[in-house]
Amino acid sequence: MPARNRPISNLARAAVRLLRGEAGAGLLLIGVALAAMVLANSPWSGLWHDLFHHQLAATPIARLDSLHAWINDGLMALFFFVVGLEIKREVLEGDLAAPAQRRLPVLAAALGMAVPALVYLAVTNAAPQLARGWAIPAATDIAFAVGVIALLGRRVPPSLRLFLLTVAIVDDLGAVVIIALVYTAGIDLVWLAAAGMILAAMTGLNLLGVARGWIYALGAGLLWFAVLHSGVHPSIAGVLAALTVPLALDRAGDSVLLRMEHTLTPISAYAIVPIFGLANAGVAIPAAMPNGAALALPLAIALGLLVGKTAGVFGAVWLAEAFKFAERPAGASWLQVLGVAALCGIGFTMSLFITQLAFSASPQLVEDAKLGVLGGSLLAGLCGYALLRRTAR
């Protein structure tokens, strides 16, 4: 190879290695978020908005009458299906299998969701029109957070990375429960009963030892359709369907769950989540920033993510060690724990998702909330990276 081409070739190989690694999904999300912000504040912002929100003249499912609806209620159900697969694997035979291993991540996730919610309610003064958004700063974007950790490489102890992953997994489970309990209204009992029967059938197939991936995929699709029409958010269908997929190895030494997770995880990380980011992260920055009452919502979310999440996760680790309930990750300093706690404040995907559910009736509140999500996530990511970078020297 000619010498002049070597730098380009080396750069290309480095880029491929990066994109294949854990940092790739996080970096892709950063690029997508920036692209969405640029487009939302460009001369093409109107066209960009219409692309996702224009009512479709023809759609096979009446409830999904726009590209935005297909992404948020359709593609994101598949994202939650992958989340469900991961949760089941981790609980049955992964890092959350042993009770002792669950203690610290569960406590950290619990306080990491409760404290941001309290910060949000305190800043908004529990205003009735804003109260439904209390769960927005309670979420963690695992792709972003792990991407930042991966950028630091071996300078961060493996125990810290594992701690972040397990906290984020428990956090995802908590977010799913919140969506099911808080952001569900107008239940259609007939469709809900149909969803229950489909779920029972899928569970029965698991108990009978049926290990055919296509059967569970078909069942998941039917369950999603029923839940979509029941009034419960269809993301719940993704998680419930995943929990029926068998993890045990069959006679050929294969696992339906592991095979599905291996196939769908890259699709979720490199296609579904970026598409969701493009459709939801774009927010027009106003000429005059919000002030007074209008500032309360974005400020509450940003402080919930940056201050509340950091304080909740770090406080949980400190309390667990102080009361000998659990020990902090092996080989990690308190400053490193603080850095990882800050990274848990990167809400992005899940926070934007909950924003759409919380303020679906008020487009202006959605836009205000997006400012808080993006600002808080950015500050949390920068603080976490800076703290971990400093301790890694």
Question: Where are the regions a protein language model picked out?
Answer:
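Alpha-helical transmembrane segments of multi-pass membrane proteins
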Residues: 32-48
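Structural signature of hydrophobic alpha-helical transmembrane segments
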Residues: 69-80, 129-143, 184-197, 233-241, ...
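Transmembrane alpha-helices that form the ion-translocation and gating core
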Residues: 107-146, 302-358, 379-390
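Functional cores that coordinate and move charged inorganic groups
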Residues: 149, 153-246
